[in-house]
Curated annotation (Swiss-Prot):
Source organism (scientific name): Draba nemorosa
InterPro entries: Ribosomal_uS4, Ribosomal_uS4_bac-type, Ribosomal_uS4_CS, Ribosomal_uS4_N, S4_RNA-bd, S4_RNA-bd_sf
Gene that encodes the chain: rps4
UniProt name for this protein: Small ribosomal subunit protein uS4c
Residues annotated as signal peptide: none
Source superkingdom: Eukaryota
PROSITE patterns registered for this protein in UniProt: RIBOSOMAL_S4 (PS00632), S4 (PS50889)
S4 RNA-binding domain boundaries: 89-152
GO molecular function annotations of the record: rRNA binding; structural constituent of ribosome
Taxonomic placement: Eukaryota, Viridiplantae, Streptophyta, Embryophyta, Tracheophyta
Major location (coarse): plastid
GO biological process: ribosomal small subunit biogenesis; translation
Length: 201
């Protein structure tokens, strides 16, 4: 299944706020998670919608998300929390959390077009997994820095999560540590996502 490129507002009307996909939010009182045409939602549908929230927020294909679930399942610790850490530490998401892009798809474009360096080297793979002490910088060219400056100016100032530091004037972000669960930028019940996939096998 390919990455979603359709109407974004349609997704947030059904699934709720997805800040990685779009800065738009559903109208107050229209949260679709509290509604259902057929009355009470089935447990399957609840798990499916949590999985879809995760997929659309981080801009993943079904195959990519399944791969992350399998990696998380083999790691030590809670599968759900490890899954969120893997997704949050992606380079495209890290740029988004730093405020260098308004959405994750926008951050992915910056990476794909070679505007971003990690530890002094261009990294053009959005799924690159950031590690503690990684230094993320914008390429030292006018068009790259102008592009990112415009995005920084357009973004709504938000408190950075504890695992990141931003040096705006140097166009530089620092990864301090692996993200804590409480700093994840999406309201999600990751256990339902893990349950969804465990029941598919």
């Amino acid at each position: 299944m390919s990455r979603y490129r359709g109407p974004r507002f349609k997704k947030i009307r059904r699934l709720g706020a997805l800040p990685g996909l779009t800065s738009k939010r559903p109208r107050a009182g229209s949260d679709p998670r509290n509604q259902s045409r057929s009355g009470k939602k089935s447990q399957y549908r609840i798990r499916l919608e949590e999985k879809q929230k995760l997929r659309f927020h981080y801009g993943l294909t079904e195959r990519q998300l399944l791969k992350y679930v399998r990696i998380a399942g083999k790691a030590k610790g809670s599968t759900g929390q490890v899954l969120l850490q893997l997704l949050e530490m992606r380079l495209d998401n890290t740029l988004f959390r730093l405020g260098m892009a308004l959405t994750i798809p926008q951050a992915r474009q910056l990476v794909n077009h070679g505007h971003i360096l990690v530890n002094g080297r261009i990294v053009d793979i959005p799924s690159y997994r950031c590690k503690p002490r990684d230094i993320i910088t914008v390429k030292d060219e006018q068009n790259s820095r102008t592009l990112v400056q415009n995005l920084l100016d357009s973004s709504t100032p938000e408190e950075l999560p504890n695992h990141l530091t931003l040096h705006t004037f140097q166009y530089e972000g620092l990864v301090n540590q692996i993200i804590d669960r409480k700093c994840v930028g999406l309201k999600i019940n990751e256990l339902l996502v893990v349950e969804y996939y465990s029941r598919q096998t």
